[in-house]
């Protein structure tokens, strides 16, 4: 190889000259023969070194195997390469060499010039976007850097970078296969090459795509943008674009005239976003998409609702009326946060299309994973594995796109098998400012869109004051998504004509920018003048279009005054047809029984302890676990993992789709679940026995997630939005880690129904328990969930027949801490069998997963049984309640510590222990019954958490309300602390010992006042 490289180094020009002759098989032939080929394939790519190497090695092996011209060339080349400069040469050879050198010099120059042109073309493809004219204001460079790459020919003197001269500008050069600027031509002059490259890469569109590591995808983009004449629009397309711009701009103008002092976060400065979104939807509809799910922030949201989703204008305008009364319970939300669902005909394609705009909070980008989850679910229920029928569009602000970490988390879900939505079109409203923050202070990367490079998503920057460029880019983006099932980003470089909101004064912080903005001609006028000048429309037609839309707005404004009541349910983004009655209420308020037939339990247990596939070798340790499950099934008992298996399996039998997601959920953080079996002999061969229960069962999805909480929990929340007939669960690796998803919990799960009248049945499984494992592996922070529960601690409830189910219907979420596998089984089934949906927070155990006493009998799970909100004392103390001196209430794992300690002290008759399985809504009725039963006993709340954490601050005032402050509820547990747990095992055991001693010291509270 080194010999060949030396040879080519010395005689490269001759080799290229030889390749260029028509009697040699050119690059692309790839055919060896004893004679010249009958047809000679030509290539615009020039010389292929690999082809020369191929010929050379073939010649070394057998000189007769190559064409005679190659044989002559290699013989001469080898001979000349072996002659050193110090060796004497015969006069004839010297004369021949001089002629050869002269020829070589010319050939070398020609080849080098062609190579320079190829490098030049590649330079524009890679770096042309840096000098594209993207800022409508002409103030900023879109990449925040005024540096011009030295390999772009922005001035004549730059030709020297490639060792080219001005005289070369009119020379013809063969174009490589990696460009389409020639169209049908194979050669162009250097001047024309530069002109076409400038036109493609350095005008109002800046393309970032050369980092993509797929040649086909790069070629596809090059062809879409480099081919001459691709951006030509018909008269009808231009008129449609103008009409859409009219609607976009006049809508904002109308709001500004009618409600000049109201916040609306208008779209002025980026009015082109409306035709941009409509183009993406039109093109996608043309390619077969039937359902588009959108997520976006507040900027321009009302305009999107009006002109993209096509919400009735009077429904939007009436929201500006301060006297409008809310018909729905709950807080409601501001108008620029509300969602929408609408089915209509797409006028361009004449096809049905469903558009959903997902409601979102002010927390920027938080809606991104929610939209992706909802999209994934809609694709799943339609059987749309390739994303041909359902797609998502996400609209972002430039500052948030660069600044919010959830954007990165969401991008990294885009190609995971259980999370991909087969491509999302991202539209960035890049108004070059974040509230008052200059982009130079808002990001370290050149562009706000650089985060998208991590998933090889192409990025199309476009000047928003060039509507035709915007529309073309959006059309290509929709095609890209349909062709490659990958994300794509459209960066609309625009400006913000007003302040962050309409009451804000931007001149305080951006005086020079806003001086320019005040001079800026609106894009509608620019484009209208252009079309009028070229004769596409007349001035009269343009004015009539404006008057027409103004009239539509005025008429809607008149109708809006008749609206006296606001129905938030009319703004629902995810309706569930047939689940509620016509008024949006549950069809019944019956509390479900959640037990199942014993033969179903046995069947699920047998499948859970087997391997349904033949010749599937599992790990020996797993064989032991499966044998244990089989043994429990025979004995009619279940542990925690088997109870979960039976809950899931029974729901699958009833046609309920189950999806479990989170970090390491397939095996389980604590190696207890093992829902996915792995063949020990065949790499990546897996088996999910849960999908082999019944022939006609619903599908079960269990999937390890990326190491993300915020993004993945948001995704699962969105997934649960799509249908009520599914059990969607997210499990934290440890309950402590849920707080990195706190935004989703606070803004969507806890408050979603109150703000947006949106039911959601998502389940959070949060491993929790004080076991001496340190402050980050102990607490799921139950106090936070209970603090956000909306039941009134001071309101004494009325105990009606349907009190239990009414409590559940009125709450914002359900919080449980199950102490038995049976309770866990029932609460999971109840979650789906209730006639409505509420989020369920489950504090799940760790050590109880294998605790010998933490088992349940089939008798507690068979037909006729149901979830017990409270499990009362059933031992000797319950037989003689009048003799009981202390009644301890507790929840979760600490129950087993208390029972063990009570037994060791022989206090079974003096101390009763009652467990709360459901903490919120608080089981007032059951607590009252238990307190009355032990009327002479001292009441104690015992928890293993610290006093300022856990449950005490929640249960204490409710006990007081229930008991009329007549009996105190004493606290037993750990002292207040800053950290949730200790990392020192000895300290943990000492504190455990201390509160257990207090719990069973019957004189501990003598003389104390409550």
UniProtKB/Swiss-Prot annotation:
Superkingdom per UniProt: Eukaryota
Q: Which Pfam families match?
A: 2-oxogl_dehyd_N (PF16078), E1_dh (PF00676), OxoGdeHyase_C (PF16870), Transket_pyr (PF02779)
Fetch the InterPro entries from UniProt: 2-oxogl_dehyd_N (IPR032106), 2oxoglutarate_DH_E1 (IPR011603), DH_E1 (IPR001017), KGD_C_sf (IPR042179), ODO-1/KGD_C (IPR031717), THDP-binding (IPR029061), Transketolase-like_Pyr-bd (IPR005475)
State where Ca(2+) binds: 130, 143, 145
What's its catalytic activity? Answer: N(6)-[(R)-lipoyl]-L-lysyl-[protein] + 2-oxoglutarate + H(+) = N(6)-[(R)-S(8)-succinyldihydrolipoyl]-L-lysyl-[protein] + CO2
**Keywords of this entry:** Calcium, Glycolysis, Magnesium, Metal-binding, Mitochondrion, Oxidoreductase, Thiamine pyrophosphate, Transit peptide
Gene Ontology cellular component annotations, sorted alphabetically: mitochondrial matrix; mitochondrion; oxoglutarate dehydrogenase complex
Disordered: region residues: 28-47
Per the record's keyword annotation, is Metal-binding included, yes or no? yes
Give the UniProt subcellular location, in the record's own words: Mitochondrion matrix
Cofactor(s) the record lists: thiamine diphosphate; Mg(2+)
EC number(s) from the headed UniProt entry: 1.2.4.2
Q: Which GO terms describe its molecular function?
A: metal ion binding; oxoglutarate dehydrogenase (succinyl-transferring) activity; thiamine pyrophosphate binding
Q: Which GO terms describe its biological process?
A: 2-oxoglutarate metabolic process; glycolytic process; tricarboxylic acid cycle
Q: Where does Mg(2+) bind?
A: 398, 431, 433
What is the first-listed, main subcellular location in coarse terms?
A: mitochondrion
Q: Which residues bind thiamine diphosphate?
A: 299, 398, 431, 433, 663
What does the sequence similarity comment in the record state about its family?
Answer: Belongs to the alpha-ketoglutarate dehydrogenase family.
**Function noted in UniProt:** 2-oxoglutarate dehydrogenase (E1-like) component of the 2-oxoglutarate dehydrogenase multienzyme complex (OGDHC) which mediates the decarboxylation of alpha-ketoglutarate in the tricarboxylic acid cycle. The OGDHC complex catalyzes the overall conversion of 2-oxoglutarate to succinyl-CoA and CO(2) while reducing NAD(+) to NADH. The OGDHC complex is mainly active in the mitochondrion. Involved in the inhibition of cell proliferation and in apoptosis.
Q: How does it assemble?
A: The OGDHC complex comprises multiple copies of three catalytic enzyme components, the 2-oxoglutarate dehydrogenase (OGDH/E1), the dihydrolipoamide dehydrogenase (DLST/E2) and the dihydrolipoamide dehydrogenase (DLD/E3). OGDHL/E1-like isoenzyme may replace OGDH in the OGDHC complex in the brain. The presence of either ODGH/E1 or ODGHL/E1-like isoenzyme in the complex may depend on its tissular distribution.
- In Swiss-Prot or TrEMBL terms, this protein is called 2-oxoglutarate dehydrogenase-like, mitochondrial
């Amino acid at each position: 190889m080194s010999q060949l490289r030396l040879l080519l180094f010395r005689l490269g020009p001759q080799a290229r000259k030889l390749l260029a002759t028509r009697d040699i098989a050119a690059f692309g032939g790839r055919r060896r023969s004893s004679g010249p080929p009958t047809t000679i394939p030509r290539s615009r790519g020039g010389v292929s070194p690999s082809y020369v190497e191929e010929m050379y090695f073939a010649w070394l092996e057998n000189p007769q195997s190559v064409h005679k011209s190659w044989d002559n060339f290699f013989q001469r080349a080898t001979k000349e390469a072996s002659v050193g400069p110090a060796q004497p040469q015969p006069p004839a050879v010297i004369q021949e060499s001089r002629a050869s050198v002269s020829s070589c010099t010319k050939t070398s120059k020609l080849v080098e010039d062609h190579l320079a042109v190829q490098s030049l073309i590649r330079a524009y493809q890679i770096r042309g976007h840096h000098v594209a004219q993207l800022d409508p204001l002409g103030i900023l460079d879109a990449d925040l850097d005024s540096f011009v790459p030295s390999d772009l020919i922005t001035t004549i003197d730059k030709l020297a970078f490639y060792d080219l001269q001005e005289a070369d500008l009119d020379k013809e050069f063969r174009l490589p296969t990696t460009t389409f600027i020639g169209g049908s031509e194979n050669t162009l002059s250097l001047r024309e090459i530069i002109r076409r490259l400038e036109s493609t890469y350095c005008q109002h569109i800046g393309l970032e795509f050369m980092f993509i590591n797929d040649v086909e995808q790069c070629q596809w983009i090059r062809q879409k943008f480099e081919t001459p004449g691709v951006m030509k629009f018909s008269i009808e397309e231009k008129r449609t674009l103008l009409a859409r711009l009219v609607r976009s701009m006049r809508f904002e103008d109308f709001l500004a005239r009618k409600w000049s002092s109201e916040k609306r976060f208008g779209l002025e400065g980026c009015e082109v976003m409306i035709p941009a979104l409509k183009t993406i939807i039109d093109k996608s509809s043309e390619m077969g998409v039937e359902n588009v799910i959108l997520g976006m922030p507040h900027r321009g949201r009302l305009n999107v609702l009006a002109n993209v989703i096509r919400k009735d204008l009077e429904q939007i305008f009436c929201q500006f009326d301060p006297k409008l009364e809310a018909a729905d319970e709950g807080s409601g939300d501001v108008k620029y946060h509300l969602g929408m669902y609408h089915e209509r005909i797409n006028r361009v394609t004449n096809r049905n299309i469903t558009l959903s705009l997902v409601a979102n909070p002010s927390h920027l980008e938080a809606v991104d994973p929610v939209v992706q989850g909802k999209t994934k679910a809609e694709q799943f229920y339609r059987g749309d594995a390739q994303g041909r029928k359902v797609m998502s569009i996400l609209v972002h602000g430039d500052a948030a796109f660069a600044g919010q970490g959830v954007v990165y988390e969401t991008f990294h879900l885009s190609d995971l098998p259980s999370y991909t939505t087969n491509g999302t079109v991202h539209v960035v409203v890049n108004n070059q400012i974040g509230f008052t923050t200059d982009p130079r202070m808002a990001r370290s990367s050149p562009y706000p869109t650089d985060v998208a490079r991590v998933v090889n998503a192409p990025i199309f920057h476009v000047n928003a004051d060039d509507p035709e460029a915007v529309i073309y880019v959006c059309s290509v983006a929709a095609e890209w998504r349909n062709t490659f099932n990958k994300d794509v980003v459209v960066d609309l470089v625009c400006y913000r004509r007003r302040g962050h909101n309409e009451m804000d004064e931007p001149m305080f912080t951006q005086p020079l920018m806003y001086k320019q903005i005040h001079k800026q001609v609106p894009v509608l006028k620019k484009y209208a003048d252009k079309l009028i000048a070229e004769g596409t429309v007349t001035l009269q037609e343009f004015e009539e279009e404006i008057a027409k839309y103004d009239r539509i707005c005025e008429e809607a404004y008149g109708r809006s005054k008749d609206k006296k009541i606001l129905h938030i349910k009319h703004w629902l983004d995810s309706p569930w047809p047939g689940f509620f009655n016509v008024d949006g209420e549950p069809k019944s308020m019956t509390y479900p029984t959640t037990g199942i037939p014993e033969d179903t339990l046995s069947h699920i247990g047998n499948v859970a302890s087997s391997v349904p596939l033949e010749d599937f070798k599992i790990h020996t340790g797993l064989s032991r676990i499966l044998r244990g499950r089989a043994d429990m099934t025979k004995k009619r008992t279940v542990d925690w993992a088997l109870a979960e298996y039976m809950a899931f399996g029974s729901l699958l039998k009833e046609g309920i789709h189950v999806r479990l997601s989170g970090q390491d959920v397939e095996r389980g953080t604590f190696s207890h679940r093992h829902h996915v079996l792995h063949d020990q002999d065949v790499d990546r061969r897996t088996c999910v026995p849960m999908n082999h229960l019944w022939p006609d069962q619903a599908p079960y999805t269990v999937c390890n997630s990326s190491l993300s909480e915020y993004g993945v929990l948001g995704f699962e929340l969105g997934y649960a939005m799509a249908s009520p007939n599914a059990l969607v669960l997210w499990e934290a690796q440890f309950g402590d880690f849920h707080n990195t998803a706190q935004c989703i919990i606070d803004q969507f799960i806890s408050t979603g129904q109150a703000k947006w009248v949106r039911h959601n049945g998502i389940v959070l499984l949060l491993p929790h328990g004080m076991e001496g494992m340190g402050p980050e592996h102990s607490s799921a922070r139950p106090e936070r969930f209970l603090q956000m529960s909306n039941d009134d601690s001071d309101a004494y409830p009325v105990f009606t027949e349907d009190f239990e189910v009414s409590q559940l219907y009125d709450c914002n979420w359900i919080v449980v801490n199950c102490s038995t596998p049976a309770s866990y089984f029932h609460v999971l089934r109840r979650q789906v069998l209730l006639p409505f949906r509420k989020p369920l927070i489950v504090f799940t155990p760790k050590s109880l997963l294998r605790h010998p006493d933490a088992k349940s009998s089939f008798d507690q799970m068979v037909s006729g049984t149901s979830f017990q909100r409270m499990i009362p004392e059933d031992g000797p103390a319950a037989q003689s309640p009048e003799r009981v001196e202390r009644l301890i209430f507790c929840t979760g794992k600490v129950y087993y510590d208390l029972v063990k300690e009570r037994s060791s002290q022989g206090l079974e008759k003096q101390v009763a222990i009652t467990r709360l399985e459901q903490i919120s809504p608080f089981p007032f009725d059951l607590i009252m019954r238990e307190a009355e039963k032990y009327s002479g006993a001292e009441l104690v709340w015992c928890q293993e958490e610290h006093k300022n954490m856990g449950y005490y601050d929640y249960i204490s005032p409710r006990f007081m309300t229930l008991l009329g402050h007549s009996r105190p509820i004493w606290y037993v547990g750990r002292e207040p602390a800053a950290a949730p747990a200790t990392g020192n095992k000895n300290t943990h055991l000492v504190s455990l010992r201390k509160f257990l001693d207090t719990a069973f010291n019957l004189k501990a509270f003598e003389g104390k006042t409550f």
